[in-house]
């Protein structure tokens, strides 16, 4: 193992070189010096910005050998592969439900805490999960993304489309 003479004064973690220590320290300061010129989103690491830029170029060099779906970064491909393996290592201690990603578990846990951190800017209604806020906001925009191939009727929610399709 390499010598780690550079130590973080905040948490005690050691690093082999000063640039890695500086990069790590931004996790404590929340400093994000790398900014996307396209959309303004900022990152604490240069690699974060580099990976993000691919969403603007559409570049997706990491392909799943199982199904052919492509991803802009290796981390997203790795997470995606859990769909095929069935791996769901993150477990909710409250109800036992399992998740393939840590952030899915964290999002789910707001259901148990009654925390509703996502607020609609249009009407003030609050939601425990971001995806539910996004679905709700379509009420205000009138967007109905799920369309019946049979008759053309459109729906706000996929479950409503599936229910509707049973009548054809």
Swiss-Prot record:
Its main location: nucleus. GO terms for molecular function: DNA binding; zinc ion binding. InterPro entries: Zinc_finger (IPR050331), Znf_C2H2_sf (IPR036236), Znf_C2H2_type (IPR013087). It is found in: Nucleus. GO terms for biological process: regulation of gene expression. The keyword Zinc applies. May be involved in transcriptional regulation. This is Gastrula zinc finger protein XlCGF7.1. It comes from Xenopus laevis (African clawed frog).
């Amino acid at each position: 193992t390499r010598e780690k003479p550079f130590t973080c004064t905040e948490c005690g973690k050691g690093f082999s070189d000063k640039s890695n220590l500086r990069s790590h320290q931004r996790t404590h300061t929340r400093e994000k010096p790398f900014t996307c010129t396209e959309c303004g989103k900022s990152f604490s690491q240069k690699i974060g910005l580099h990976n993000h830029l691919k969403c603007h170029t559409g570049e997706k060099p990491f392909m799943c050998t199982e199904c052919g779906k492509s991803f802009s970064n290796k981390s997203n491909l790795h997470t995606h592969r859990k769909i095929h393996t069935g791996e769901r290592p993150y477990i909710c201690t409250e109800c036992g439900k399992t998740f393939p990603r840590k952030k899915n578990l964290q999002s789910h846990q707001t259901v148990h805490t009654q925390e509703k951190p996502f607020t609609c800017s249009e009407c003030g209604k609050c939601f425990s999960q971001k995806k539910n806020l996004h679905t709700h906001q379509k009420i205000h925009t009138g967007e109905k993304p799920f369309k019946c191939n049979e008759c053309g009727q459109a729906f706000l929610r996929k479950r409503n489309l599936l229910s509707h399709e049973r009548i054809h």
